[in-house]
Amino acid sequence: MSLHQFLLEPITCHAWNRDRTQIALSPNNHEVHIYKKNGSQWTKAHELKEHNGHITGIDWAPKSDRIVTCGADRNAYVWSQKDGIWKPTLVILRINRAATFVKWSPLENKFAVGSGARLISVCYFESENDWWVSKHIKKPIRSTVLSLDWHPNNVLLAAGSCDFKCRVFSAYIKEVDEKPASTPWGSKMPFGQLMSEFGGSGTGGWVHGVSFSASGNRLAWVSHDSTVSVADASKSVQVSTLRTEFLPLLSVSFVSENSVVAAGHDCCPMLFNYDDRGCLTFVSKLDVPKQSIQRNMSAMERFRNMDKRATTEDRNTALETLHQNSITQVSIYEVDKQDCRKFCTTGIDGAMTIWDFKTLESSIQGLRIM
């Protein structure tokens, strides 16, 4: 595991370029900083300044090498690099509340933006007018959209929101998409069609993170009531929900067709397994804490603790986990959702950690990525 402390401020969100030599992140303000890897060091290469509100989402398209950002100023920008300089293009989102999340589609010909306006803007490039325009998915969303993920077919879109529900919509746009083939989620896919809806029957919480599996047949989401859920469209949309004993999880990603990594307020990534029988189980925490050493205190330390912390005990305030505060985002670092070898986490502590499954499997007894 490699940990890099980028900032003292929280990292709101991040995105990697195609070959993982650069990372774009927001230091909890209206800027995007792009860091470049030089040996074992990360050096700041660019600062993207166009937003005038907090940046809430970043995504970097691997093939076209374009960055999309969205923010609390209700705007989104598509950034393209020309002669080593990143130039922004404004996107017409048509929203009256903050944008909360942004994600490129797999073919990179459109992207989706969630917002506090209780809608999703699906944006595509209109070449005759030379600008990015959007279509809105509104019904039946009743609250802020917190998270989005695209199905591999480039048409279906999963959305988690503050009305305690996780939904799958069709984001088919005839101007840029070919007619989609039938999927286990459904066959008729006009724009805005609600394909599936989960949660919200008296229980649940805000849906913080959603993730399709590599096949697109499974959908995982994490909610503020400390639950992890997986829906399997190939098993007539059977839902398995696991109520965990942990603090709420904020981000989730499939790392194989049967394995899910999630992380959040416990400052530690966790591995869950979903087997072919439809059973969802907790496997292990992936951050193995070092054993704390008991030691005797001097009288001087005892009095200092009484003065500073109103206690006579030697309480170390550092957490045993690598991250010292909540993890806000999990992303795939090496390979893909089908066969992830390494994944990355960033958090409120301003740190970025890269986790290697091979190293984890050797240090955690019985750990295997299925």
UniProtKB/Swiss-Prot annotation:
Transmembrane segments: none annotated. It comes from the Eukaryota. It is found in: Cytoplasm, Cytoskeleton; Nucleus. SMART domains: WD40. GO terms for molecular function: actin binding. Pfam families: WD40. PROSITE patterns: WD_REPEATS_2, WD_REPEATS_REGION. One of its GO terms (biological process) is Arp2/3 complex-mediated actin nucleation. It comes from Mus musculus. WD repeats lie at residues 6-45, 50-89, 140-179, 202-241, 244-284, 322-365. Probable component of the Arp2/3 complex in which it may replace ARPC1B. Probably functions as a component of the Arp2/3 complex which is involved in regulation of actin polymerization and together with an activating nucleation-promoting factor (NPF) mediates the formation of branched actin networks. In addition to its role in the cytoplasmic cytoskeleton, the Arp2/3 complex also promotes actin polymerization in the nucleus, thereby regulating gene transcription and repair of damaged DNA. The keyword Nucleus applies. This is Actin-related protein 2/3 complex subunit 1A. The gene is Arpc1a.
